[in-house]
């Protein structure tokens, strides 16, 4: 499928009624040591049981209204890294195009949105499920809209993940 066709199919995915999981972990200190570990919330445990060994595509917004705001983009990347680490720490196999892309972008010239979406959508095809990190204004992200459209066409299960407190 040509990714450009996905851009011309606007759908309001915020009203689709996807399952929502509040992924939060609580720091726990054991009696036998001062070491802390993160105990997953009941909702996080339900998410683990739901996805099993599936490979998750973690979709998250990078731009705001189609433009990159430097500080906001940095905050979104950091929030995505935190969620990526949380999910991996819970034993979930997960891929994040934002973390992957921002990690390698300094090694070449800026390729632009269409170049990145080409590779992101290739990776989405390889994943079993799509989870959207519900950062502010995620519904307005063109990239997320395209990812959800392709996931819907491919009949991949879609989840919304809220950042835990």
Indicate residue ranges for each PLM-predicted region.
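Conserved catalytic or regulatory cores that recognize and/or transform ribose-phosphate-containing ligands
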Residues: 2-165
